């Protein structure tokens, strides 16, 4: 369906493209396409793995081909962390963010909340301000030139010690970038990602409980490779949003809680397929979530690595589930309602969704 092969698919493609979207689960470092990795490596004199040690890095083409064959989450992460080493300057981070925002805007994204991973960059010697200010530059440009609204979510990495996350959290607070009482609150939430199975489920509990007291928005990756208990642990330490969450259906009682508390799941179907969490997009519990009243949005996760930006993810879901226009309206509206934006912006986006649906209701 991306691209469409029949007139009927063309109509659906036009609708899904036009439908105003909110993206809540995309890692900016996961938007490093192979051409950008190689060009930034040359510019910044960064040595990528030699072709003899890792043939994937022989060329842009070989790296692109390797991206289609990840065996697991950790296999993907090994490439993900190598890729981000090419980022060195504030302008690099701004360029990366802008590259994503342009693509997202072209595919109908009106609001996006993006993850970034400062810990790894800081561990290799980059200054905190270089990272944050670069991404903020990209966000401001997107808002000014594209008219989309943006939010930055600072992600803690589960494979690193709690102390590393605590230092980052303290730095963000001291710099005034985080929290309602921050001098310049450019970071709008906290997240937790990287390897799921292995680290303690509640690794960041001390940080999250403190952040909750400051009314800082909290989310966490859970229920991707780990079972539903990882989702419960994230909720119990203060998360009000769950990233992935596809294992939720294994626990009916927990699913009732998630629906009742209007927790938003940021589902990434193509990512789940690429990382072997499911055998097909049809195994992602989209229909089950709709029937149970569980709110979710559909997202691209790390689109440069998984070969699918948000429109392709929407198309993949439509191909797998044959949803109705009413289903898509609900998904889009729940994405707005679960966003970390003010009521005025939410109402504006809900109006845009309504106008889009009106144009297509009699066609599909």
From Swiss-Prot:
Cofactor binding: number and manner: Binds 1 zinc ion per subunit.
EC number of the protein: 3.5.4.2
The keyword Oxidoreductase belongs to this UniProt entry's keyword annotation: no
PROSITE patterns per record: A_DEAMINASE
Active-site annotation: 224 (proton donor)
Entry keyword set: Cytoplasm, Hydrolase, Metal-binding, Nucleotide metabolism, Nucleus, Zinc
Binding site for substrate: 302
HAMAP family xref list: Adenine_deaminase
Protein name per its UniProtKB record: Adenine deaminase
Gene coding for it: aah1
